[in-house]
UniProtKB/Swiss-Prot annotation:
Transmembrane stretches, start-end: 6-26, 35-55, 71-91, 101-121, 131-151
Record Gene3D superfamilies: 1.10.1760.20
GO MF terms, alphabetically ordered: folic acid binding; transmembrane transporter activity
Pfam families: ECF_trnsprt
InterPro entries tied to this protein: ECF_S_folate_fam, ECF_trnsprt_substrate-spec
Record membrane topology: Multi-pass membrane protein
Protein name: Folate transporter FolT
Role: Folate-binding protein that interacts with the energy-coupling factor (ECF) ABC-transporter complex. Unlike classic ABC transporters this ECF transporter provides the energy necessary to transport a number of different substrates. The substrates themselves are bound by transmembrane, not extracytoplasmic soluble proteins.
Entry's localization field: Cell membrane
């Protein structure tokens, strides 16, 4: 029964990620600004690295299948998995702290968003990495504090509402 409950919570987070990414985002060919990171970060808090990674990757694949915007590229699925795993490493069974949030968001910004995703976009578009990187660097500089503030606020809210205690009993 406990595993079923975890799967239900995971499905809910996948659904939220798809809705936040596909409907509540601004997207150009090389930049997407949205809030799909919130359910992915919360998955890291609730389920740990591996299950959060599954939520991230599944969200990417299902989102692309249900609401395609261009060709499917597995590199972005890998990026979604890696980003979610990083959230899980920094947030699962940990106390809320600004330092943890800044480290997680910083590593995801540099490793996933600026490095991996820029490489994937270069492969897909053929544009020079330098050109893509400059545009993406501006976007990431704007989004970094937004991500950090929103994730920290969500984590504090989850902590106050004792949601983690309720979910933790299903993870054992």
């Amino acid at each position: 029964m406990k595993k079923v409950n975890v799967m239900i919570y995971m499905a809910f987070m996948i659904t939220l990620e798809i809705v936040f990414t596909r409907f509540l985002s601004i997207q150009t060919p090389i930049i997407r600004i949205g809030f799909g990171f919130i359910p992915v970060a919360m998955s890291g808090m609730m389920f740990g690295p591996l299950l959060a990674g599954i939520v991230g990757a599944t969200s990417d694949v299902l989102g692309m299948m249900i609401f395609p915007k261009g060709a499917y590229f597995p590199g972005f699925t890998l990026s979604a998995f890696v980003g979610a795993v990083i959230y899980g490493v920094f947030f699962y069974n940990k106390k809320v702290s600004v330092k943890r949030v800044l480290l997680a968001v910083g590593i995801i910004t540099v490793l996933v968003n600026l490095t991996m995703n820029t490489i994937w976009l270069q492969i897909l578009t053929g544009k020079a990495v330098k050109v893509l990187f400059v545009t993406r660097l501006v976007k990431e500089a704007i989004m970094f504090p937004i991500h950090a503030i929103v994730i920290y606020g969500a984590w504090k809210m989850v902590d106050r509402l004792e949601i983690m205690n309720k979910v933790a009993k299903f993870n054992k």
